Amino acid sequence: MNKIYSVSHFSFIDGIILRKRKEMLKIIKKTLEKYNVLSCIDVGTTSYEENESSNYIIKNLSHIPNIISISNQEIKNPLFKEKILKSITQNFSNDEFFKLKSDIVISNATIEHVGSFENQIKMVNNIINLSKKKFIIITPNRYHPIDFHTKIPFLHWLPKVIHRKILSLVGLSFYSREENLNLLSKADLIKIMNDLNFKNYKIFNIKLLGFVSNFILIFKIN
């Protein structure tokens, strides 16, 4: 699997993304306010820090004493007490789960970059095994009119085979490969949770231009 990709945005677009991430952060802080959170894993941390929106959510949870990064990129940010150079879709040993398990696990804009639907299920299953209290997964909505990866409107609404073929034809071969971009709908998220028999979750909507742009899936362990 290729490295989880961080998009270099124009400042205008990054400003929009930043505003949306501020909304997400409010929801996350609200859902965590009753919990004594001493440890956190950030899944899919990006090494690309030039966008103001990059790693925005975890940077604004820096009050948590012990923050760990799990990423297939080399992370140098001193925010993280431990940096695990590993894809979240890889196998974890029982010892790794025991050692790394944290109060909460957060993953923002990562699940759409891990490849197939089976890989997305594996990612969520690994996350549940790394979580003590809650996990939070944030991902773009496939059915928002604009895909902020390609900046092309509506094309991603086509069947995925056709969408990927057109991306390849117009020179966006990176995004044409499932291993690099596999957008999800709300129904896809629900199916993942159902396939894993996880019931105790909520999905929050973030809107942009009147359409749902992102989903925040929050699962409560206990």
What are these regions (language model features)?
Residues 134-162:
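Conserved class I S-adenosyl-L-methionine
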Residues 35-144, 219-220:
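Conserved SAM-binding loop
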Residues 9-15, 109-118, 175-180:
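Surface-exposed cleft-lining segments at the edges of enzyme active sites
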Residues 201-222:
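Core SAM-dependent methyltransferase catalytic element
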Residues 150-153, 160-179:
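Short, glycine-/aromatic-enriched active-site segment of Class I SAM-dependent methyltransferases
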Residues 176-197:
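Short alpha-helix
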Residues 1-35:
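Class I SAM-dependent methyltransferase Rossmann-like catalytic core
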Residues 16-24, 49, 119, 181-188:
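Soluble or luminal CAZymes and related metallo-dependent hydrolases
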